[in-house]
Amino acid sequence: MSKPIVMERGVKYRDADKMALIPVKNVATEREALLRKPEWMKIKLPADSTRIQGIKAAMRKNGLHSVCEEASCPNLAECFNHGTATFMILGAICTRRCPFCDVAHGRPVAPDANEPQKLAQTIADMALRYVVITSVDRDDLRDGGAQHFADCITAIREKSPSIKIETLVPDFRGRMDRALEILTATPPDVFNHNLENVPRLYRQVRPGADYNWSLKLLERFKEAHPEIPTKSGLMVGLGETNAEIIEVMRDLRAHGVTMLTLGQYLQPSRHHLPVQRYVSPDEFEEMKAEAMAMGFTHAACGPFVRSSYHADLQAKGEEVK
C-alpha cells in the first residue's frame, strides 16, 4: 500500500501527484490510446510573440497569475497577442483536485492583501476596457475568497472607472450565504460560474462539487441582481452526450442564466481525464441554435471556446466561436 501524500503549504501538486488524491481514480492514458486530433483542432501560433512576452512580464513583475497560463489554455497565444488576459486571484494553488483541470492542487498560502491594488494598477497600466477575474477554489477561507473578489472589484474600478468587469467565481461550497452577501454588495458587470459538465459525470469530473448547488448559486445571484447577466460554461468530450448537454442548457435557463459557453475538452496531460470524443464545428453550431431557441441572449459555441474567450465580445452579443 502506497503512503499518502503529505502536502506542504505553498507547494504545487500536478499531474500524477494531483490525480493520486482524487476519490475516483483515473488511469494514465498511454500514447497509443490517445484520440487523434482532427484538423479543426489545429492551432496556428502567431509569428510575433512580443505582446505575449510583454503580458507575461507584467504578470511576473506584479506577482500576478493568469488562468490562461495556469490552466494551459489553448487560446493563450491568441488572447495575449490581442492584449487580453483572464486574471486569477487568490494564488495559483487550488484546494480542489478536478481531473480535467491543469491548475495545481495543494495547501495554499494566505491571500496576498496587496493583490487587489497590484491587480488594479496592472489593469490600468495595460489600459484594459474589459477584464475577467477568476480564482482558484479556496475552501480554506471562511468566505471562500468572496471578500477578496469584492476588494479586487473595488480597487479596479477606482483606477479604471469605465472598465467592465466579469467575475468567474468558484462554487463557495458550504458558504454560499456568506459569499453572496459580499458579492451582491459589490457586483460585477457579468457574473459567471461554470457547471463544466453534465450531472451524470459530476463525481468523476468535479469531485467535491454539486450540480444543484452550482445552479442555485447562479439563480440566487440573478435574483439579487436581475439586471446583471449571468453566465455559465461547459466542456464537451468527457463522455457526455449532446442530449445531456442540451438538458443542462435547459436547467441553466430555468435558473435565470442568460449567457452560455460550450467548448471542446482537451486533456492537459496523460494523467488527466482522457478525451472521449471530438465534437465537430457543425455539432457546436447545432447546439448554439438550440441555446438561442431556449432564450439565451448569447451563446459562444465552438471547439476553442472557453468561458473567458473574447469575453468582451460575448458581453456585447457579438459572435464568438
From Swiss-Prot:
List of residues binding [4Fe-4S] cluster 1: 68, 73, 79, 308
Cofactor binding description: Binds 2 [4Fe-4S] clusters per subunit. One cluster is coordinated with 3 cysteines and an exchangeable S-adenosyl-L-methionine.
MF term (GO), any: 4 iron, 4 sulfur cluster binding
Subcellular localization, as worded in the UniProt entry: Cytoplasm
Keywords: 4Fe-4S, Cytoplasm, Iron, Iron-sulfur, Metal-binding, S-adenosyl-L-methionine, Transferase
Pathway: Protein modification; protein lipoylation via endogenous pathway; protein N(6)-(lipoyl)lysine from octanoyl-[acyl-carrier-protein]: step 2/2
Keyword Metal-binding recorded: yes
Annotated GO CC locations: cytoplasm
Matching Pfam families: LIAS_N, Radical_SAM
EC number(s) stated in the UniProt entry for this protein: 2.8.1.8
Annotated Radical SAM core domain residues: 80-297
Binding site for [4Fe-4S] cluster 2: 94, 98, 101
Necessary cofactors: [4Fe-4S] cluster
Source taxon at top rank: Bacteria
Catalytic activity: [[Fe-S] cluster scaffold protein carrying a second [4Fe-4S](2+) cluster] + N(6)-octanoyl-L-lysyl-[protein] + 2 oxidized [2Fe-2S]-[ferredoxin] + 2 S-adenosyl-L-methionine + 4 H(+) = [[Fe-S] cluster scaffold protein] + N(6)-[(R)-dihydrolipoyl]-L-lysyl-[protein] + 4 Fe(3+) + 2 hydrogen sulfide + 2 5'-deoxyadenosine + 2 L-methionine + 2 reduced [2Fe-2S]-[ferredoxin]
Membership in a protein family: Belongs to the radical SAM superfamily. Lipoyl synthase family.
HAMAP family reported for this sequence: Lipoyl_synth (MF_00206)
Protein name: Lipoyl synthase
Taxonomic source organism: Cronobacter sakazakii (strain ATCC BAA-894) (Enterobacter sakazakii)
